[in-house]
A protein has these predicted regions:
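Acidic/His-rich structured neighborhood in mature extracellular/periplasmic domains
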Residues: 309-484
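C-terminal edge beta-strand
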Residues: 119-129, 214-228
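Exposed beta-strand face motif in extracellular beta-rich ectodomains
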Residues: 105-109, 200-204
Length: 667
């Protein structure tokens, strides 16, 4: 271990930018980019470096600072405010600090961490803010850290004088390895963090020009962490080809805190060093035959940001009245919630579920930390003539509400149920499929999570094996289309020629509740259980429809439904397979509830997706609305198509430890 450690404060003009109106404090033009400064890491013997967004800022924009590793990784970062008006630190366990200063003054912070040698270190930061001005300003949110190869999003937030409007927002990179900025939406800059030799800052500037001729700018600090991910061709790596982001145990003093992240979300995991259940047991082993307490569940939660764990705990305390979610969670070893987890998935290799934090934010500040980069798989199936739509409704209203990304929106606690309830039922349906209650008593501490699952999975004993065998989906056409829509297979000329009406006929005659069931048998079972539980436990009914592929500018009010149903899960032909799924995966529920499901309601072919919210009676007035689309109309249609991109199945090798051969995993 080295005895001499050196740290330098980067004091060059490239990082210590004076206010002078250039950081959101007024209407002055943006200052010219400063010449690059030498990195403090270039000094021999330096193991870490510190960066600040600027020495002086104006209130109303975000302050930022970072600790970077020069010769290796920084571990266990923790930011604490030590002076100034109180601010919320939502990324306190990240290498990069972001905070919102609403008033002028001096703000001070301490960063505690372990440097690249493992030595405990502490650094103090002081950032001054001038008083909040009344002029035009621009704030970039948020300063943050990302591992190389990760998606990055930064959003620009203009504040304008009354009657003024945005003319342009332009972006420029000021420092760091060159990246390609996607600014097709000028309010957001997207890029992929580049490969770096050491932790490296990237600095962007956005400049606002208004219709009245005013201007303002702000800068943002993004620290790219040097963290090697597992190579895609590394057959022994558990996360080969995947991006694994930084996470930590939500409860640092919990009984499993020391091993949680290492056992379920670490790029270094390999199939020959999986954690044994003696290190991290399934929740069922800890609970026995009872229902887990919220505290027992929270001891298994791993997060990128503590707010995600806090809101997940509120979700359980408020919305798990009947204990279904906690009972289902007995089949997992951990719950990972991350701002870079997209899409959500379950992984039998670790026995954990992985949830997109976008489902759990409540405040605009929490939302600022959630990555906005879309999943590349959203382009699948673009040559087909049809699309499928879905939503959950209560009465005649969709439970999915529009939260304008350009507004500082706060969501109520009920949003946690609306946004995350269906997701939890779906991913936990997968967990129960691979580890049903009937096998809890066979779990052995000496085994691994995958070692406990593999014999049944490879032996064809899962519900996703037995139920489709007894009650199969029979449409080969829909199965083929499922490969196009959910795995990116190229569509054939025949597939591209199918009309929405033809696809609707293929689907309606079969036993699936959603065309996502044709992705894999695992999704078939999870979709069926999800819709049943949403209907019987939460009183939300599911709409599913087939429609023509929407063109540019289409909305829920203009797209025409070719065929659809509300509550397809109540279709009599589906009940035998549903009953078998419930009996195997949710035995605490009386299977007689399957027969108590309401009969499905047919949608009105030829009416719009929005018009079909009112069933069975149509709303008065014209059925198809040709008015100028609103943002909400556009969003509701996007949401109706988007679910598949949040739950995209993705085959990847499972650990070979138990059987010696890989098996396909549904994520």
């Amino acid at each position: 271990m080295r005895t001499l450690q050196r740290v330098l404060l980067l004091a060059g003009a490239a990082w210590l930018v004076a206010a002078c109106g250039g950081n959101g404090g007024g209407d002055e033009a943006a200052p010219a980019p400063a010449p690059p400064s030498p990195s403090p890491c270039d000094t021999p013997g330096t193991t870490y470096a510190r960066f600040t967004k600027a020495a002086v800022l104006s209130a109303g924009v975000g302050g930022g600072a970072a600790i970077a590793g020069c010769t290796g990784a920084i571990a266990s970062p923790q930011w604490t405010q030590t002076g100034g008006p109180a601010v919320e630190l939502l990324s306190a366990k990240s290498q990069t600090l972001h905070f919102e200063a609403l008033t002028g003054g001096r703000y001070s912070f301490r960063a505690d961490f372990r440097d690249t040698t493992g030595a405990a270190r502490s650094e103090d930061f002081v950032i001054d803010f001038a008083p909040l001005g009344l002029g035009t300003r621009l704030a970039l949110r948020a300063n943050h850290s990302v591992r190389m190869g990760g998606n990055v999003s930064v959003r620009a937030w203009p504040t304008l004088a009354g009657g003024d409007s945005v003319a342009t927002i332009t972006w420029a990179q000021l420092e760091g390895p060159a990246v390609t900025l996607d600014t097709r939406d000028p309010n957001v800059a997207l890029f992929v963090a580049p490969q770096v030799a050491r932790d490296t800052p990237i600095r962007l500037r956005a400049t606002l020009t208004t219709a009245a001729g005013h201007s303002a700018s702000d800068e943002v600090l993004v620290l790219v962490e040097r963290h090697a991910q597992a190579a895609a061709n590394d057959s022994g790596a558990l996360w080969a080809g995947d991006h694994v982001s930084r996470v930590h145990a939500y409860r640092p003093n919990g009984p499993h805190a020391a091993v949680l992240a290492a056992c379920v979300y670490d790029s270094a995991q390999r199939d020959n060093n999986l954690c044994r259940l003696s290190q991290l047991p399934f929740l069922a082993q800890e609970v026995g035959t009872g229902v887990p307490t919220v505290e027992q569940v929270m001891n298994r939660v791993v997060v990128s940001h503590d707010w995600a764990g806090r809101n997940f705990e509120a979700f359980l305390n408020t919305h798990d009245v009947q204990g279904d979610f906690r009972r289902m969670l007995k089949s997992v070893a951990a719950i990972v919630i991350g701002t870079h987890v997209r899409p959500s998935f379950y992984y039998a290799g670790t026995g954990a579920i992985y949830l997109d934090a976008d489902n759990f934010w409540l405040t605009p500040e929490e939302r600022d930390t959630v990555n906005e980069a879309p999943d590349f798989r959203s382009s699948f199936g673009q040559t087909l003539q049809y699309t499928t739509l879905w939503r959950y409704v209560q009465g005649t209203q969709s439970i999915f509400r529009f939260y304008d990304p350009r507004q500082r929106v706060t969501r109520g606690n009920v949003a946690l149920l609306e946004e995350a309830g269906w997701l939890m039922f779906h991913e936990l349906g997968h967990a129960l499929d691979f580890l049903p209650p009937s096998v809890y008593g066979t779990l052995q501490d000496a085994n691994t999570a995958w070692g406990s699952i593999a014999p049944r999975a490879n032996g064809g004993q899962l519900a996703s094996h037995t139920v489709p065998s007894l009650y199969p989906l029979t449409s080969s056409v829909m199965s083929g289309l499922g490969q196009v829509r959910f795995f990116g297979a190229a569509a054939s000329a025949t597939q591209n020629a199918y009309s929405p009406q033809q696809v609707a006929a293929f689907f309606a005659a079969d036993l699936a509740t959603d065309d996502y069931a044709y992705a894999t048998p695992f999704e078939d079972v999870a979709m069926t259980l999800e819709e049943f539980l949403m209907a019987r436990r939460l009183n939300y009914r599911r709409d599913f429809a087939v429609a023509a592929r929407p063109g540019p500018g289409a909305t829920g009010s203009t797209i025409t439904v070719a065929w659809g149903q509300r509550g397809r899960i109540g279709e009599p032909a589906l009940r035998p397979r549903l009953r078998a799924i419930v009996q195997q995966l949710a035995p605490w529920i009386d299977p007689a509830e399957v027969d108590q499901l309401a009969a499905p309601i047919a949608m009105r072919a030829g009416d719009s997706w929005t018009g079909n919210l009112s069933l069975p009676a149509p709303l008065p007035g014209p059925r198809l609305h040709k008015t100028e689309p609103t943002l909400e109309d556009l969003w509701q249609l996007e949401r109706a198509e988007r679910r598949r991109h949040r739950l995209q199945p993705w085959s990847k090798p499972l650990p070979r430890q138990a059987t010696g051969t890989p098996a396909a995993a549904v994520r």
